[in-house]
């Protein structure tokens, strides 16, 4: 059967990435979902990250986001902090332990990206990213 439908190919690529990434991340006691949350926290923690921010960014349900954060908290990688601007709101932030691991985890992300796109030239990789962003309506971001 010829695979010529973009939705099927994108899903297969996602599953292949998760298979490769989970094998690599096992050494760090992280799942792909936990890694993605850590990556987001590294990038956005200065702006204050709430559970709802994770839900929106990754299109995940509230229970899923809560579960991932709770597991990261048990591993000592994230903590909740009070929001000084809103008494009923809390932020999620990387712990000192997580900040120490940041360079290694970010490098790991680059390695995973390279592994997934190793059959593409640099120009093809850029085109792929551009097309995926366009498909998702993220061209200007």
Question: What do these predicted ranges mean?
Answer:
Residues 1, 122-141:
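C-terminal regulatory/oligomerization modules of transcriptional regulators
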Residues 1-28, 75:
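N-terminal leader segment of winged-helix/HTH proteins
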Residues 10-13, 17-20, 58, 101-117, ...:
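Alpha-helical linker/hinge and terminal dimerization helices associated
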Residues 19-61:
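N-terminal helix-turn-helix DNA-binding core of bacterial DNA-binding proteins
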Residues 51, 69-70:
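Short, hydrophobic-biased segments on the C-terminal half of alpha helices
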Residues 70-129:
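Charged, amphipathic alpha-helical coiled-coil/dimerization segments
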């Amino acid at each position: 059967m010829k695979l010529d439908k973009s939705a099927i190919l994108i899903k297969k690529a996602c599953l292949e990435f998760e298979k490769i990434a989970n094998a690599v991340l096992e050494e760090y006691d992280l799942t792909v979902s936990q890694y993605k949350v850590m990556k987001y926290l590294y990038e956005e923690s200065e702006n204050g990250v709430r559970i709802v921010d994770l839900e929106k960014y990754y299109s995940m349900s509230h229970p899923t986001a809560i579960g991932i954060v709770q597991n990261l908290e048990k591993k000592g990688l994230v903590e909740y902090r009070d929001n000084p601007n809103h008494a009923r709101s809390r932020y999620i932030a990387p712990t000192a332990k997580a900040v120490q691991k940041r360079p290694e985890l970010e490098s790991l992300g680059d390695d995973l990206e390279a592994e997934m796109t190793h059959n593409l030239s640099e120009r093809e990789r850029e085109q792929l990213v551009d097309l995926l962003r366009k498909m998702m309506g993220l061209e200007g971001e």
